[in-house]
Amino acid sequence: MRKAEVKRKTKETDIYAELNIDGKGNYDIATGIGFFDHMLSLFAKHGLFDLKVVAKGDLEVDTHHTVEDVGIVLGNAFLKAAGDKKSIKRFSTFYVPMDEALVRVSVDISGRSFLYCDLPLKAERVGNFETENVEEFLRAFAYNFGITLHVELLHGGNSHHIIEATFKALGRALDEALRIDERAEGIPSTKGIL
């Protein structure tokens, strides 16, 4: 099984994560940010990843440091757990509707860090979660995992629905891209490296 454990401690945050890519969607999330916990739970459940995240951050300042640093830790955990990436499918695109919202997420487990994010969010907050931190999380995750990630809102207006569809689609897309293809041999690249 492809598993990882990552710890990261700074003056702003103290984060621990356990990941099993080949899990069943079990999760135990405690970041101190209720809405973010909910999104990470959806991500794990729909990606079928077993995920534990325990984060303590300077929430008296705001949620930015905690959300971004969880993205860093999870990106590192996925990178570590993915191992040599032999025989993975590598690419995936997933669409997820949430009522009026429709979000498309495309991933390439490429070894090249890039984020394209087009998620216009009308609300500044959902609960105590600053919505601008969605992009901060996605950037930290993509850059620390070393993936190309495109996230686009095709239509919708409710910020909660848009963010929820995003995390579900990200989980589904990663599940597909990281799946082992029994027909494939070696690294899925003509370069021989990802």
Swiss-Prot record:
InterPro entries hit by this protein: IGPD_sf, ImidazoleglycerolP_deHydtase, ImidazoleglycerP_deHydtase_CS, Ribosomal_Su5_D2-typ_SF
CDD domains: IGPD
Pfam annotation, one family: IGPD
Catalysed conversion reaction: D-erythro-1-(imidazol-4-yl)glycerol 3-phosphate = 3-(imidazol-4-yl)-2-oxopropyl phosphate + H2O
Source species, domain of life: Bacteria
Top EC class, one word: lyase
The enzyme's E.C. designation: 4.2.1.19
GO molecular function, one term: imidazoleglycerol-phosphate dehydratase activity
UniProt key word Transit peptide: no
Cross-referenced HAMAP family: HisB
Chief location of this protein within or outside the cell: cytoplasm
Protein family: Belongs to the imidazoleglycerol-phosphate dehydratase family.
Name of the protein in question: Imidazoleglycerol-phosphate dehydratase
Cytoplasm is among the record's keywords: yes
Localization in the cell: Cytoplasm
Biological process according to GO: L-histidine biosynthetic process
GO cellular component assignments: cytoplasm
Pathway assignment: Amino-acid biosynthesis; L-histidine biosynthesis; L-histidine from 5-phospho-alpha-D-ribose 1-diphosphate: step 6/9
Keywords tagged on the record: Amino-acid biosynthesis, Cytoplasm, Histidine biosynthesis, Lyase
